[in-house]
Regions:
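Short glycine-cluster motifs
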Residues: 1-55, 64
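Glycine/Thr-rich phosphate-binding loops of Rossmann-like dinucleotide-binding domains
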Residues: 60
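Periplasmic-binding protein-like
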Residues: 46-57, 85-90, 118
Length: 133
């Protein structure tokens, strides 16, 4: 990530964020925090892959986060996304089902991963597939 991305993220995220990769937006993240952070990462040409991972917590709404991510991806300039991997993974079986349906309805189906390790593996597979083409 560029210094500009880290600086912009400092303004968006809690002070205890990692200031590096991976970018943890914390379990209490609102949809706005998802969208704003995603927009900053999309704008950084040094970032070639983004995994948006939502884990169920009692502090945040997965549907709100999904709507915000869909909005941020639709608002992004098509050229900003060209050649970049953006993968979404909404974890959990039942709590995430409505959010995953929102992605499917927006023609942005999330990965079928239901655990964090399998979500991380999915982005590795996507990058390897693209590089082999």
């Amino acid at each position: 990530m560029s210094k500009e991305t880290i600086s912009a993220s400092d303004r968006l995220l809690p002070a205890s964020w990692s200031r590096g990769n991976p970018v943890d937006i914390f379990g209490d993240a609102s949809g706005k925090r998802y969208a704003d952070t995603l927009a900053v990462l999309i704008d950084d040409r040094e970032v070639d892959a983004i995994l948006v991972l939502n884990c169920p917590t009692g502090l945040a709404q997965p549907d709100e986060a999904a709507r915000a991510v869909i909005g941020a991806l639709k608002a992004a300039e098509p050229t900003a996304l060209r050649g970049r991997n953006v993968i979404t993974a909404w974890l959990g079986e039942y709590t995430a089902r409505p959010a995953r349906q929102l992605f499917a309805d927006a023609r942005m189906p999330p990965t079928k991963a239901r655990t964090a390790p399998s979500a991380v593996s999915s982005i590795g597979y996507a990058i390897a597939t693209i590089k082999s083409c």
